[in-house]
């Protein structure tokens, strides 16, 4: 009781804040109680009031309700996300209770510097912006304290990269009270999803809280489950690669004798080399569990390279064979054949020449076989990649800090 009045006196002089009642009544009779501020024991009582309340052998239980109002600026390349939260903390401090029969006030508000409040630190935060620099705590007549803290923060997130850009990730926010021990303080956390806007690439589809066990420092953890719903990434990454692969397959329909085929294939390969560099740069990377698209784009590059090499080799062999046929001994003139009594080719030989001319050379036959095998290989690649995408899973190695609770030495 005396600690409460000491806080009230300090509030009037040090902070110049008017105490408000639930029903809107102002504090009266201040002139009569001001002389007590010069009491010698005042500083001791004030110091006692800003210490953690004693709950006997049990730790003080602080109920925390986390209201998530927005998640934005999710950057998977930087492994960061921004969020806006409202923390509603409540606990019991019997030192602040008063008798309503003597002092008919149901509730008062106090600046949080004048009483004990849990000092929270977000472990994953790069920066934290507390929206209210001087929040007010509401104290009920029975000593229940309620404090609302609004904040915006940017935190690190361990994104799931394997299935990017259709990834599902769990991002955690760990709140620690570093000025207290687990024997003094305990959190009971709840989370509420108040996000009303879904026009984001990443959508929060689930929230959960937990209190990690075996911690020397009291803490609670809020986990946000994010789902990537962006269609832009799929169009920007997959459509150009698939279009070039389809164009390469269609290029196999050109005859091997066509001069344009080699230029067509080489142009596609060079175009995909430039595209491959930009595609890989647009994908996130990690020491483990890299996106499957990195391997997929590399396989497409190998397919285009193999197709181009096949065209160049077989076209070169075909041109060399034609050049050898042209440089062979030329047949004797028709006049000389008649002089030697050779009446010329038999009429039955003419159809045989036509049949022989319609037959394909072995490079062209090999090209047709390669084309069929290449088409089958491309289709199999698509189906195999789809199966791997659906059933593949990858678990990264545990970080060194996750091998032991906070404040302990890692296990060897």
From Swiss-Prot:
UniProt keywords, alphabetically: Cell membrane, Disulfide bond, Glycoprotein, Ion channel, Ion transport, Ligand-gated ion channel, Membrane, Receptor, Signal, Transmembrane, Transmembrane helix, Transport, Zinc
Sequence ranges of Basic and acidic residues compositional bias: 335-353
Biological-process GO terms, alphabetical: monoatomic ion transmembrane transport; response to zinc ion
Reactions the enzyme catalyzes: Na(+)(in) = Na(+)(out); K(+)(in) = K(+)(out)
GO MF: extracellular ligand-gated monoatomic ion channel activity; ligand-gated monoatomic cation channel activity; ligand-gated monoatomic ion channel activity; pH-gated monoatomic ion channel activity; transmembrane signaling receptor activity; zinc ion binding
Subcellular location: Cell membrane
TM spans (from-to): 234-254, 266-286, 299-319, 369-389
Residue spans, topological domain Extracellular: 26-233, 287-298, 390-412
Tissue expression per record: Detected in pancreas, brain, liver, placenta, trachea, kidney, spinal cord, stomach and fetal brain. In the adult brain region expression is detected in the hippocampus, striatum, amygdala and thalamus.
Cysteine pairs bridged by disulfides in the record: 157-171
Ranges of the Cytoplasmic topological domain: 255-265, 320-368
UniProt modification remark: Glycosylated.
Glycan-bearing residues: 41, 55, 99, 170
Activity regulation as described: Inhibited by the divalent cations magnesium and calcium.
Signal peptide: 1-25
Annotated spans, Disordered: 328-360
InterPro entries cross-referenced by the UniProt entry: Neur_chan_lig-bd, Neur_chan_lig-bd_sf, Neur_channel, Neuro-gated_channel_TM_sf, Neuro_actylchol_rec, Neurotransmitter_ion_chnl_CS
CC terms in the record's Gene Ontology section: plasma membrane; transmembrane transporter complex
Topology in the lipid bilayer: Multi-pass membrane protein
Chief localisation class: membrane
UniProt function note: Ligand-gated cation channel that allows the movement of sodium and potassium monoatomic cations across cell membranes when activated by zinc (Zn2+), copper (Cu2+), and changes in pH. Could also transport cesium.
Assigned protein family: Belongs to the ligand-gated ion channel (TC 1.A.9) family.
Protein name (record): Ligand-gated cation channel ZACN
Organism lineage string: Eukaryota, Metazoa, Chordata, Craniata, Vertebrata
Gene designation per UniProt: ZACN
